[in-house]
Regions:
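N-terminal regions immediately upstream of nucleotidyltransferase
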Residues: 1-96, 101-117, 136-138, 367-373, ...
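Conserved catalytic core of two-metal-ion nucleotidyltransferases
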Residues: 48, 58-64, 112-200
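Extracellular structured ligand-interaction cores
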Residues: 97, 134-136, 143-145, 248, ...
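Terminal (often C-terminal) interaction modules
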Residues: 2-35, 301-394
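Glycine-rich, often proline-containing surface loops adjacent to acidic residues and nearby aromatics
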Residues: 92-102, 224-234, 269-271
Length: 394
């Protein structure tokens, strides 16, 4: 039965009205995006390995006879904590960042001296597996990469926040998201975490100062604000109807797979840029991808200054040259055109083919339409969508 505003089809033993929105049948396209997102996210085994790696590291730090005396707390940051990580490719491993909040006075210890305090601990537990980097200590295990990021002593008020169980917990933004959608909590700690990370910008607790981390190469202590990065992402995801973190994952995958040899922007700078360009109130991941790419094309012909979350004087794009940005911008122009064509396609099969052109083979293929349904543009799916917990949808 053909209706004036859509097409009534029978699929999965139920009638579904597929309304053309933006030129395509969004309810069906979303099932393809759901499987795509399931394909590119960290696997359960990779998440388990990350947890094994960071919990072992944090326990060893807390139990170390020397370091335990100067450590206030440890907590997770990075794309894993923000739920914007995608699965690694080409033999790379999953990674997680561990912030180590210390009592060290930045006036008494140079960055190099602060990092060197960890060497005996590293020699004991991670001999031949660690490297001292510019602003952190990298640990490469057979199954996961870890980054230790030490900080200098925070203020007294900040110390209390950084020792809060919800901050030092391992809950990710997707964990918070589930509770935001269902308003249900299975323990007091998760409810407390939800309440803290869903606070608004003007809450006093988020007037906290940035932390100082050692920059060995610049020979100075530098500001960072990982908690504000987490809070900002939680808020943005809520404002985007929980689609934001999936827009980030989709575009990270595009960057990783379609332009693997392009040096910049790397993971977090790209994520930050997506955050600045993705509109609020998007109705789907597909819409978020299209509008984000088009906003970059229309608003950022030249390399912008990207003010870091919580440290606005820092430029997230500082390490990117104008030439590198120009190369990246050209790739975005191409991607924006493909994404818009995919979004506006009249036929589902053609739309899916365009999305696969953008995202590669992890975006599931659509069977070619038969003569019986080619006139409607509807392609019946032959495979069931992968199960993704509520909230992880396109």
């Amino acid at each position: 039965m053909i209706l004036s505003k859509g097409i009534l089809v029978h699929t999965h033993n139920q009638s579904v009205l597929l309304i053309k929105g933006g030129g395509l049948f969004m309810s069906t396209v979303q099932s393809y995006f759901k499987d795509f997102l399931s394909n590119i996210r960290l696997s359960d085994n990779q998440v388990k390995e990350l947890k094994t790696g960071h919990t072992t590291l944090r326990r060893r730090l807390e139990e170390d006879e020397t370091l335990s005396k100067i450590i206030i707390s440890t907590f997770l940051q990075g794309s894993y904590r923000r739920s914007t990580a995608v699965k690694p490719k080409n033999g790379n491993k999953s990674d997680v960042d561990v912030i180590v909040v210390t009592k060290l006075d930045s006036e008494e210890y140079t960055p190099e001296e602060a990092l060197d305090l960890f060497v005996p601990f590293l020699e004991k537990h991670y001999k031949d597996k660690y490297r001292i980097q510019g602003r952190s200590i990298g640990i490469s295990l057979s199954y996961v990469d870890l980054d230790i990021v030490p900080t200098s002593a925070p203020s007294e008020s900040e110390t209390e926040v950084l020792q809060d169980e919800t901050i030092i917990s391992e809950y990710t933004i997707e964990d918070f998201q589930q509770k935001f959608l269902t308003k249900s909590f299975n323990n007091d700690l998760l409810e407390s975490a939800y309440n803290i990370f869903y606070k608004s910008d003007n809450e006093p607790q988020w007037k906290a100062e940035p932390l100082l981390i050692p920059d060995r190469e610049a020979e100075k202590w530098d500001k960072t604000h990982p908690l504000e990065q987490i809070r900002w992402t939680v808020e943005k995801n809520k404002n985007c109807n929980t689609h934001y973190i999936n827009v980030v994952k989709a575009l990270k995958w595009w960057r990783k797979t379609q332009y693997p040899d392009m040096k910049h922007p790397k993971s977090y700078p790209l994520e930050h840029f997506i955050g600045d360009c993705c509109p609020n109130d998007i109705k789907s991941v597909a819409e978020g991808v299209v509008l984000t790419l088009e906003n970059i094309v229309s608003q950022y012909t030249n390399k912008p200054f990207l003010a870091d979350r919580g440290v606005p004087e820092h430029d997230v794009f500082a390490r990117i040259t104008d030439e590198e940005y120009s190369d990246f911008y050209d790739t975005v122009c191409d991607a924006a055109k493909i994404a818009r064509e995919a979004f506006d396609c009249e036929e589902l099969y053609d739309s899916v083919c365009k999305w696969r052109e953008l995202f590669g083979n992890e975006f599931p293929p659509a069977p070619k339409p038969s003569k019986s349904n080619s006139s409607t543009g509807f392609t019946t799916r032959t495979e069931k969508s992968a199960a993704i917990p509520e909230g992880r949808f396109a």
